[in-house]
């Protein structure tokens, strides 16, 4: 999934793909249970992000434009829809040992995942700049320009994703051709070189946007917390709507941070090949990795006013039942 040629090099270098014959019955049942969970999880993610992208995309076409924040969310949802789709294809190509076909989808995964990273980063920066109450002149300058810069930032994400895909495709092609020969010493050295190459590639493409995301979310949480404490100091016995809204925003940001960070950490750990494609834990690892980004998208969906309105229209009975439960509570 993440390491584009990791399984492919192993497959051409003398090892087979995921062989079920080596698993005990207990491990085999474990293997298939998590495979089914991964498929269900991916289907939920596809429906969720597809719904989010469709609603905002339709609004974009209808009104000939979107607010800058919704524009980023629409592009982020589209990239995650593609990411989950490509991840499903990649994993099943690995399962049936179609290594040469997997290379092309792995390059596509690199492109989509890089775009996803940068769109998430732009969203965090946008909300940080728009909502935070810092008084530094540079902050005011960014706040004044950020909305007009969003289309260019999104275009930049596509360019960076394209560069990532070119880099990945180049490394894949060289390594795959070198391992096609019968020289196993060369194949081993090629795997070692590619592992080092891909780790550097992944760290460059993932860590930079994640650091900006982390910084933006922490600054925003600090600003909201400071403002909340100021309101509580001025009105210590008041629990008005504004205080509740700030508290809910802080909780949402905390979950936002935890879920997305878990996705990034599992990706980074996977580069070290803690769990490879031949392991019975492979599907369990995939479930855990993509769970973070699925929950992250859920928060985006539920915190967006347009999405809440669309959900009420699409599922009125569910919303009525939920409101009745709240009244009873």
Swiss-Prot record:
Pfam families: TAS2R (PF05296)
TM ranges: 28-48, 69-89, 122-142, 154-174, 202-222, 252-272, 283-303
A Gene Ontology BP annotation from the UniProt entry: detection of chemical stimulus involved in sensory perception of bitter taste
Sorted UniProt keywords: G-protein coupled receptor, Glycoprotein, Membrane, Receptor, Sensory transduction, Taste, Transducer, Transmembrane, Transmembrane helix
GO annotation, cellular component aspect: membrane
Membrane topology, record value: Multi-pass membrane protein
Cross-referenced InterPro entries: TAS2R
Domain of life: Eukaryota
Statement: the UniProt record of this protein carries the keyword Protein transport: no
Glycosylated residues (UniProt): 183
Recorded family membership: Belongs to the G-protein coupled receptor T2R family.
Additional record remark: Several bitter taste receptors are expressed in a single taste receptor cell.
Protein name: Taste receptor type 2 member 134
The species this protein was found in: Rattus norvegicus (Rat)
Lineage: Eukaryota, Metazoa, Chordata, Craniata, Vertebrata
